């Protein structure tokens, strides 16, 4: 019998969790590349609205109330279910119990809507009329287009060219929700014109193009789908729900897993459990990334730009270097040279682990999961499945009844050409 754990809307957390309030160390601040000193709030206000900047630097409040307007939009698809992967367990013949948090039932099919709605709302109340952003595989661009439509904001998206060509359905969704989509690198910006027109692009280049647009205008702000503290904050709705769902089952997780590109999905999943780890509970957190873009497993922990052209502040993070151009893999949402400062600091302090998987291994896991569990996962999410399978097989070798939880961050119904 398939085991679902559903929460009623009344049981859904009405707050986001701020891990910065609990960490036993301080994050290194973003630096102004012109001075190598901490970035002034005045400069950041050119890029982000004040309410999001306040969330970005808040390291005192443990919980941040979710505004009623956002809760009303969350009610369309949240809470999301926690599902036991019974068929996968049986196939693997493992004593482990595997649970997955399914974020694919959001309006645009991934976890990205959790922060897109929040960012659109805070920009709206700040009087912003136009947002510029980047997107890799299109999940973030889709989510922000949807959220912009909900809150009356025009959304302009620079989509990494390789994904722009690979994923036409994602372009259609963005256009359906009135988003304006441009392949990156483009001829629109100085940042884009540095590259040949058929260049595959990268998230770093697309961020540069969006940032360049904002810095040249007075009517626009920038929205980022991952990496920054406030983005991970909004995504903690995932982990907070998981905690409540596991409490209903009266079980404690041994391992929590998520795919990792910039860190929003992984952070949103594991951050609410960090206090448990800090209090001495034996719980592991595993970030699963692609071998072709091994930011956490092979990157350097240092200050670097978040984009290719150098428009962003310098962030202390694991990085492959701002000029790194990843191979044109199908998991376009994971093709990022850097990582969230929060996730990077947790890894540097040995509070989390990171593992890299090949595209072949992740798609093997994705196909198996599709056939057994009946959900076709996004290529990005497939890295978490591969990680969960690996942990379940280790439990089988050790003959241990581990509780494994992972987030299935989105469905792959718009990525079917990757499965052919």
Curated annotation (Swiss-Prot):
Q: Name what cofactor the protein needs.
A: pyridoxal 5'-phosphate
Q: Which keywords, in A-to-Z order, does the entry hold?
A: Amino-acid biosynthesis, Aromatic amino acid biosynthesis, Lyase, Pyridoxal phosphate, Tryptophan biosynthesis
Query: So where does this one cross the membrane?
Result: none
Signal peptide start-end: none
Q: Name one Pfam family in it.
A: PALP
User: Which reaction(s) are listed as its catalytic activity?
Assistant: (1S,2R)-1-C-(indol-3-yl)glycerol 3-phosphate + L-serine = D-glyceraldehyde 3-phosphate + L-tryptophan + H2O
Its quaternary organisation is:
Tetramer of two alpha and two beta chains.
| Family membership noted in the UniProt record | Belongs to the TrpB family.
In Swiss-Prot or TrEMBL terms, this protein is called Tryptophan synthase beta chain
Name the source organism: Thermosipho africanus (strain TCF52B)
The encoding gene: trpB
């Amino acid at each position: 019998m398939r085991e679902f754990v559903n929460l009623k809307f009344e049981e859904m957390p009405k707050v986001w969790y701020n891990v910065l309030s609990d960490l036993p160390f301080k994050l290194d601040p973003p630096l102004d590349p012109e001075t190598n000193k901490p970035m002034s709030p005045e400069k950041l206000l050119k890029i982000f609205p004040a309410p999001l900047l306040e969330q970005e630097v808040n390291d005192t409040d443990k919980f941040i109330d979710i505004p009623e307007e956002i809760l009303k939009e969350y009610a369309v698809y949240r809470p999301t279910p926690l599902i036991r992967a019974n068929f996968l367990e049986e196939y693997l013949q493992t004593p482990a119990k595997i649970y997955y948090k399914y974020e694919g039932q959001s309006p645009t099919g991934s976890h990205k809507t959790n922060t897109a709605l929040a960012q659109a709302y805070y920009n709206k109340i700040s009087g912003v009329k136009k947002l510029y952003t980047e997107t890799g595989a299109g999940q973030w661009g889709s989510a922000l287009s949807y959220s912009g439509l909900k809150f009356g904001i025009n959304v302009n998206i620079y989509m990494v060219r390789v994904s722009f060509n690979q994923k036409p359905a994602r372009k259609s969704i963005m256009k359906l929700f009135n988003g304006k989509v441009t392949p990156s690198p483009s001829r629109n910006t100085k940042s884009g014109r540095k590259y040949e027109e058929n260049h595959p692009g990268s998230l770093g280049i697309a961020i540069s193009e969006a940032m360049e647009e904002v810095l040249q205008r007075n009517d626009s702000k920038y929205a980022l789908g991952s990496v920054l503290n406030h983005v991970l904050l909004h995504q903690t709705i995932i982990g907070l729900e998981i905690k409540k769902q596991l409490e209903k089952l009266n079980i404690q997780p041994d391992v929590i897993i998520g795919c990792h590109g910039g860190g929003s999905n992984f952070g949103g999943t594991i951050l609410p459990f960090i206090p448990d780890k800090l209090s001495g509970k034996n719980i592991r957190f595993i970030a699963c990334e692609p071998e072709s873009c091994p930011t956490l497993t092979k990157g350097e922990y240092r200050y670097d730009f978040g984009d290719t052209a150098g428009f962003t502040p310098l962030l202390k993070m694991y990085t492959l270097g701002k000029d790194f151009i990843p191979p044109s893999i199908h998991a376009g949402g994971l093709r990022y040279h850097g990582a969230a400062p929060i996730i990077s600091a947790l890894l540097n302090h040995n509070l989390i682990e990171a593992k890299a998987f090949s595209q072949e291994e992740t798609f093997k896991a994705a196909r198996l999961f599709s056939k057994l569990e009946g959900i076709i996962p996004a290529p990005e999410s497939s890295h978490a499945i591969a990680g969960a399978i690996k942990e379940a097989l280790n439990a089988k070798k050790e003959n241990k009844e581990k509780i494994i939880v992972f987030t299935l961050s989105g469905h792959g119904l718009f990525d079917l050409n990757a499965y052919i």
